[in-house]
């Protein structure tokens, strides 16, 4: 497929087929049988399995597509410019300047 280097199309299709089988193996639970609590528990277990399938799918794609094993370094500003002073935060513009600017004429 265009735009990727070093990835075989057959490997990618194989990964997609594996992921498709994983998702098909966990259909949404039947909501017409059982008590409300039983249906709720089935949905809760289904969501937990979906989270597991999603995590496995990410690992499969990562193995087939590769990618950086370590997080990408983000450019940070110089440490001298970083402060924890709340006065320099720009949360609501104009709120601090209004507190002490009462003029009497």
UniProtKB/Swiss-Prot annotation:
A matching Pfam family: REV
Chain residue ranges for the region called Homomultimerization: 18-26
GO CC annotation, single: host cell nucleolus
Chief localisation class: host cell
Keyword Signal: no
Compositionally biased spans, kind Basic residues: 37-49
Highest taxon of source: Viruses
Motif residue range(s): Nuclear export signal and binding to XPO1: 74-85
Post-translational modification comment from the UniProt entry: Asymmetrically arginine dimethylated at one site by host PRMT6. Methylation impairs the RNA-binding activity and export of viral RNA from the nucleus to the cytoplasm. Phosphorylated by protein kinase CK2. Presence of, and maybe binding to the N-terminus of the regulatory beta subunit of CK2 is necessary for CK2-mediated Rev's phosphorylation.
Record keyword RNA-binding present: yes
Sequence segments annotated as region (Disordered): 24-49, 65-105
GO molecular function: DNA-binding transcription factor activity; RNA binding
UniProt entry keywords in alphabetical sequence: AIDS, Host cytoplasm, Host nucleus, Host-virus interaction, Methylation, mRNA transport, Phosphoprotein, RNA-binding, Transport
Disulfide bonds: none
Transmembrane residue ranges: none
Biased amino acid composition, Polar residues: 24-35, 95-105
InterPro entries: REV_protein (IPR000625)
UniProt motif (Nuclear localization signal and RNA-binding (RRE)) ranges: 35-51
Cellular compartment(s): Host nucleus, Host nucleolus; Host cytoplasm
Description of its domains: The RNA-binding motif binds to the RRE, a 240 bp stem-and-loop structure present in incompletely spliced viral pre-mRNAs. This region also contains the NLS which mediates nuclear localization via KPNB1 binding and, when the N-terminal sequence is present, nucleolar targeting. These overlapping functions prevent Rev bound to RRE from undesirable return to the nucleus. When Rev binds the RRE, the NLS becomes masked while the NES remains accessible. The leucine-rich NES mediates binding to human XPO1.
Record's subunit section: Homomultimer; when bound to the RRE. Multimeric assembly is essential for activity and may involve XPO1. Binds to human KPNB1, XPO1, TNPO1, RANBP5 and IPO7. Interacts with the viral Integrase. Interacts with human KHDRBS1. Interacts with human NAP1; this interaction decreases Rev multimerization and stimulates its activity. Interacts with human DEAD-box helicases DDX3 and DDX24; these interactions may serve for viral RNA export to the cytoplasm and packaging, respectively.
Family that this chain belongs to: Belongs to the HIV-1 REV protein family.
Other facts: HIV-1 lineages are divided in three main groups, M (for Major), O (for Outlier), and N (for New, or Non-M, Non-O). The vast majority of strains found worldwide belong to the group M. Group O seems to be endemic to and largely confined to Cameroon and neighboring countries in West Central Africa, where these viruses represent a small minority of HIV-1 strains. The group N is represented by a limited number of isolates from Cameroonian persons. The group M is further subdivided in 9 clades or subtypes (A to D, F to H, J and K).
HAMAP family to which the protein is assigned, alphabetical: REV_HIV1 (MF_04077)
Function: Escorts unspliced or incompletely spliced viral pre-mRNAs (late transcripts) out of the nucleus of infected cells. These pre-mRNAs carry a recognition sequence called Rev responsive element (RRE) located in the env gene, that is not present in fully spliced viral mRNAs (early transcripts). This function is essential since most viral proteins are translated from unspliced or partially spliced pre-mRNAs which cannot exit the nucleus by the pathway used by fully processed cellular mRNAs. Rev itself is translated from a fully spliced mRNA that readily exits the nucleus.
Name of the protein: Protein Rev
Protein species of origin: Human immunodeficiency virus type 1 group N (isolate YBF106) (HIV-1)
Organism lineage: Viruses, Riboviria, Pararnavirae, Artverviricota, Revtraviricetes
